[in-house]
Amino acid sequence: MKKLVPIEIGEEKRPKDIKAIQFRLASPEKILSWSHGEVKKPETINYRTLKPERDGLFCAKIFGPIKDYECLCGKYKKMRYKGVVCEKCGVEVTTSKVRRSRMGHIELVTPVAHIWYVNSLPSRIGTLLGVKMKDLERVLYYEAYIVKNPGEAYYDFEKKNPVKKYDVLNEEQYQQLVQHFGDTGFDARMGGEVVKELLEEFDLVEAFEQLREEMKNTNSEAKRKTIVKRLKVIESFLNSGNRPEWMMLTVVPVLPPDLRPLVALDGGKFAVSDVNDLYRRVINRNQRLKRLLELDAPEIIVRNEKRMLQEAVDALIDNGRRGNAVKGANKRPLKSLSEIIKGKQGRFRQNLLGKRVDFSGRSVIVVGPNLRMDQCGLPKLMALELFKPHLLAKLEEKGYATTLKQAKKMIEDRENVVWECLQEIVDEYPVLLNRAPTLHKLSIQAFHPVLIDGKAIQLHPLVCSAFNADFDGDQMAVHVPLTEEAIAECKILMLSSMNILLPASGRAIAVPTQDMVLGIYYLSKEKEDAKGTHKLFADINEVMTALESDYLDLNAKIRTKIDNQVIYTTAGRLIIKSILPDFVPVNLWNKVLKKKDIANLVDYVFKEGGPKITAEFLDNLKELGFKYSTVTGISISAYDIKVPDSKKRLIEEAKRKVKEIQQQFQAGLLTEQERYNKIIDIWTDTSNEVAKEMMELMKNDKDGFNSVYMMADSGARGSSAQIRQLAGMRGLMAKPDGTIIETPIISNFKEGLNVLEYFISTHGARKGLADTALKTANAGYLTRKLVDVAQNVKITMDDCGTHEGVEITDISVGNELIEPLEDRIFGRVLAQDIMDPITNEILFSEGTLLDEEKTRKIIEAGIKSVTIRTPITCKAEKGVCAKCYGLNMAEGKLVKPGEAVGIIAAQSIGEPGTQLTLRTFHVGGTASRSAEERQVVATKEGFIRYYNLKTYETEDGKIIVANRRNAAVLLVEPKIKALFNGEIEVKPIHDEVLITLSNGEEKVRYSFKKSDFARPNELAGVSGKIEGKLYLPYESGTKVEAGESIVEIIKEGWNIPNRIPYAAILKVKDGAPVTQKIVSGAKGVVKYYKLKGDYLERFEGVKEGEKIEEKGLFAVIADEEGREAARHYIARGSIIEVADDQSVDKDTVIAMPAKSDKTVIAEWDPYSIPIIAEKEGVITFEDIIPGVTAVEQVDEFTGETRLTINEYIPAEYKPAIVLAPKDGSEIIRYVLDPKTAIYVQNGQEVKLAQTLAKTPKAAAKSKDITGGLPRVSELFEARRPKDPAVVAEIDGVVSFGKPSRGKQRIIITADTGQTVEYLIDKNRQILVHNGEFVHAGERLTDGTVSGHDILRTLGEKALMYYMVSEIQQVYRRQGVNISDKHIEIIVSQMLRQVKIVDSGDTKFIPGDLVSKKEFRKENEKILRLGGQPAIAEPILIGITRAAVSSDSVISAASFQDTTKVLTEASVSAKVDHLEDLKENVIIGRLIPVGTGLYKDRKVKVETASQE
């Protein structure tokens, strides 16, 4: 970094380029040096002559002439007198634009405080002097005295309590102290003067030393905080070279008059800029004060005037910051200097970040179906206006006009040669089209204009989805790029034919929609028994001839030869084939093409052929689609909407079921909640059933050529949900608050709704409209925050050289897959080698970029977790390196240095924001509830392993889960079997694990990477995924028999309590095999092998129909070369379908399970939480008193009375069931929650695992689930949830300490003896029990886990994993695809600061938040000098805070909190190095990304002369 030299920006010598901008406090001398004269009078202009008053606010002598090169009195006119000062009116003869830059000043009679440094928190003046802000205000506004010199004054007669400097006194105290101690040098005064004097004498260095001393010696946290605050302010003054007294103004600068203009309106009135009014008040009061002082007026009057002056200056700088705002003539507050720069209408956002530009126009858009992909239709009249300068030059160059005037005349007369020339200019000249709102980079694209008649712009139908445009009156803007470079960028980077992929996900966005899809779908559909079915044709020409001579139907199934193979296809599909490039395989086009299939087709063509071929292909596809949707003439009539006959029957049945539920409820068998839930479930199922029948009916109507069905099925328009409302039943509706009305709408729109149904459905319709309006604003604000936080992230280097990465798996919630692994790793770079789990060879090495091909190989190898590089672990000094980012989604290539990945990330997340929902889901609130989960089912084959699992067996032989946590049921397949009887030894060495089996004579050892094994906290379900990891069933030192598996691969896992709750009934025993239908993963020959040690041994003679009793059997499919193409584990009990050495195709069934129904792992009662007896023994009740804490309920069916705990329990009672075990061990207490039903009697003997009581689930408070946009905001803002879960910070054993003040105390003790205590509110549900082992990061209470806790307990990678999966859940559920890397970039920005814990010898202060970059730099410096480095902890900051605390002042100021940012910057004299995008846009330089980076590298853009 070169030494930066400050430059004065005067009028004449504006520097060409600025390297950096520094913000500082201006000293009075500085302000005077800017000024061209003092403004003495409040007058503006003389209303008769309309000339500025001398010495007034618009004075020509001070600010410069009003007309170019002409003095005010008119003595000197013309250029030749430039620089002469007129002796009569004192005006310098120069250009009038100096009135935009020349400043004046006002000399104040008394110093006043600058309100920003008094009132903006923390108050700088107050903090510096150590005076409270309120007190400081009282002093400045002449209501209190501040002690300047205490002399020997005391507050009391015993002289115990001395008066200190800076004490603030009221009138009474002051009078008394003056009386007693006036002669001892006691001095206290009020107002700006004394504050200025105090600031002048303030010794910064001494204060700094003193405070550092105090800091070391103090123990109180509160005191430390105040000291740190003061230290920060003092330090900023010391480092910046600012003087504290400059925060007091003695001279007020006056803004140049052209920046606060007077505009003459018609009718002799003037529109005055508010700032003038505010200046007038300052001048008036200042002059009056001057006179009063000259007249020696009474103190009280002077004091009042001084106070008014202070208020006037306050209003000028920041009106309304303190007290009431000064209002103008029309009763609205005046806009002060601060207001002019802040907010959406302020200088930053209105004029600097976005400007209106020349050479632009806008008009309505219409569809242009005959344009090429890179063309747009531009109305001639618009082109004429936009290209006028070009046209004038062209007319002269061609010799049609000799002068400019003549050329202008020709254009006005619209002569024919004009159009000729215009056409020449427009050829090969791109224009930019933009549609507001510009949500992502595809909202501005370049096109080659085609001149058209008419006044509307024509837009190509395929780019509509990128612009989000439709033709119902949308408007678009046209911009003309002017410089050679801009034109080159338009042609190379911005042409619409280059922007086929969406930057958010890398999927094609220029995909046919609506009519085009319908036409293509129709073409590719098969019709049974159509004309010409089963005929054989030689080639497409023959087919076309047959079609034209009406010998063949378009949809007939025919045979023809493609790639030397005879295949079945249809004539229509061959027409599609004719426009496809040759490299597209048959399976992609020879099927019914729906919207998804067409998108896949486009993706494939792009991947194999590149943008040029794709653009051509898309145009052909568009032509084809439009042609055939027109020819077929598909249309809807009411008769195409078919209502199923079975509807009546289904509804009768549902009503019957509902009646039964109601009866059970009245009999007291169900709680209100259960009744409601069950009824909702019944109607949801019925509605789905009716919809299913309806879709079946429509599908079979007219052989599948029913128009309505075709539109929905092809994805052209409408969905099954909409058709369901037209022809099925409308189903359940929600009330405005989100709860579901339990009576559904039975009618559909074809039958018509009755009055009540109509009324119920109006809620939803109106809410939908209101939501949409709110949503747009929220999504826009989210985008703005994201852009601001990420705008400085760009690709700065090719490779940062890190070996770190984050291990990722697919994202799933319960059984629902949110984002598959292939989507997550596609386009990323590996951080570790990937091993083939079967052959143990390296599949791909570290540093490989995964394209689709490689991704597919990884998934086919059965790998479940991959470690990839990510922006969060990137070590690049600024920005991110290309390897940590991976593929540029919009190009399908590795990203290039200079790419503005931050902005792209922000746009990719923000743009789909409008598609997200806004609502907060209530439990049981959405109109499509999924039935409660009541069991888990195995989906893979293998055998069962219990991990840490304790169970109870009941009398009737049921197995019940006894663990509450830290246990799991695993489904595994063997990886290594013991070769002989022996003892296992497991030994970790560095990052490897050695497993040895020995028995004295024989010994074998196997080694694995440590990271391949599932960690205990993963098995317990605290973090990460376990599928695909290795598991060791035996601990070190265990003896095993030959044939036992000693290393296993986990295929599925269900942890407790997340997947299987406490007291669930287990349906599988440890070691039990689980069989599934096994389908071959490849084409080839099946050979059977048996696992022996860690290798496979051939196992011959397996026959079809045989039931497998062998352990460790594998079916291996060998391809033509005899290599292993796929491997399948065959569990015991499977029935073989394919004998040894037989050939199979892909997807052939190899083995079948012994029993046909699915394997249930565990099941439980979803509506209640049971309490079970942990031992045999006798029950006694405690505090269970009928009528006080409990109520007796008689069961009508059994006649038994049962006790239920009341909903509200008096505070002094704690109802509990106490169990005294038979074996005499310690008694066990079960504390009962409200609403618990008790299933035992007092004094009863109970058996092991008997149910003692049940708490209904609904009583476990139903919390609202935040979904959609609010959830995304919540995550990015890093808001702490309302009541967050308390999270364990260390691994250890739980115990309960003695409660304090009604709070429960949880103590966690680690093996090392370290303990952590937590106090927990009594109304929180505690999820852990005494003596249980918990992992760091595990929840101890109910509630949402906060991101801050994850970061603190599990670290940055776990936090990233959590953030990405939470945000992806929201977007994926709405069907939006966003690549993970975009979210990771934002998260890395949220983690860019650290909090100093211990400052060592650095300049930091504990509690400081500093950027990681600064922290590293400072520590390196201190280490070089041999000092003690600082220690910091990572913190998570929300995007708003991250954007405001940006390193760049200008960027932060233009985002939010403008005054606060500028105050902070000026006090600490911050320098903005103009490294990022926003600052450069504001200053008006090229932005330093993409092609703008080469500006510094002196690369010249050579344009080839156009022949």
Curated annotation (Swiss-Prot):
Q: Which UniProt keywords apply?
A: DNA-directed RNA polymerase, Magnesium, Metal-binding, Nucleotidyltransferase, Transcription, Transferase, Zinc
Q: Which GO terms describe its biological process?
A: DNA-templated transcription
Question: Does Phosphoprotein show up as a keyword for this record?
Answer: no
This chain belongs to the protein called DNA-directed RNA polymerase subunit beta'
Q: Which organism is it from?
A: Nitratiruptor sp. (strain SB155-2)
Q: Any binding details for the cofactor?
A: Binds 1 Mg(2+) ion per subunit. Binds 2 Zn(2+) ions per subunit.
Instruction: Return the similarity comment.
Output: Belongs to the RNA polymerase beta' chain family.
The protein's gene is named: rpoC
Keyword Transcription present in the record's keywords: the answer is: yes
